[in-house]
């Protein structure tokens, strides 16, 4: 542990978009991304949800892994399980994130700062960046910055097949 008792962790998550007509809602960074009223039927597929055992919120899931890694408390799979019968099945990522913060506290850690980079072509995160930062910061109890980038049409995110996120978090021993 560092001299100041500050530890750093990194997390990553990726999910494919659900097939059109699946009925999955799109949740990213604790926010629901509805299909805009002005959206054409052809463009509505951009707002199809994300496949996953939970809501597939890659930002929340990457942040969970970063926080757990910093405190050396495992990862999202070791805490919530995987598959349809897992403790995290059907849950919102933001709720899981709040549970992780409580788990950190019960083990003597508190989040100090975090950042999440969302990687994908859709939806356009910048239009709701402030909301995303507010939602994640409220859940974690510390400042969380949110950035977004595309991959210039490279890889599965560039082809529009899915979305990913990388997160870094600082936690302090209390």
UniProtKB/Swiss-Prot annotation:
BP terms from Gene Ontology = isopentenyl diphosphate biosynthetic process, methylerythritol 4-phosphate pathway; terpenoid biosynthetic process
**Catalytic activity line of the entry:** 4-CDP-2-C-methyl-D-erythritol 2-phosphate = 2-C-methyl-D-erythritol 2,4-cyclic diphosphate + CMP
E.C. numbers: 4.6.1.12
Q: What class of enzyme is it?
A: lyase
Q: Where is this site: Transition state stabilizer?
A: 53, 150
Q: Which cysteines are joined by disulfide bonds?
A: none
Tell me the cofactor note: Binds 1 divalent metal cation per subunit.
**Which superkingdom heads the taxonomic lineage of this protein's source?**
Bacteria
GO function terms (MF aspect): 2-C-methyl-D-erythritol 2,4-cyclodiphosphate synthase activity; metal ion binding
Pathway(s):
Isoprenoid biosynthesis; isopentenyl diphosphate biosynthesis via DXP pathway; isopentenyl diphosphate from 1-deoxy-D-xylulose 5-phosphate: step 4/6
Q: Which InterPro entries match?
A: MECDP_synthase, MECDP_synthase_CS, MECDP_synthase_sf
> Which residues are noted in the entry as a divalent metal cation-binding?
13, 15, 61
Q: Which cofactor does it need?
A: a divalent metal cation
Keyword annotations from UniProtKB, A to Z: Isoprene biosynthesis, Lyase, Metal-binding
- The UniProt record gives the binding positions of 4-CDP-2-C-methyl-D-erythritol 2-phosphate as 13-15, 75-77, 149-152, 156, 159
Please provide an example of a Pfam family that matches this protein in its UniProt record. Answer: YgbB
Record HAMAP family: IspF
Task: Indicate the quaternary assembly.
Answer: Homotrimer.
* Family per record: Belongs to the IspF family.
Q: What does this protein do?
A: Involved in the biosynthesis of isopentenyl diphosphate (IPP) and dimethylallyl diphosphate (DMAPP), two major building blocks of isoprenoid compounds. Catalyzes the conversion of 4-diphosphocytidyl-2-C-methyl-D-erythritol 2-phosphate (CDP-ME2P) to 2-C-methyl-D-erythritol 2,4-cyclodiphosphate (ME-CPP) with a corresponding release of cytidine 5-monophosphate (CMP).
The entry's protein name is 2-C-methyl-D-erythritol 2,4-cyclodiphosphate synthase
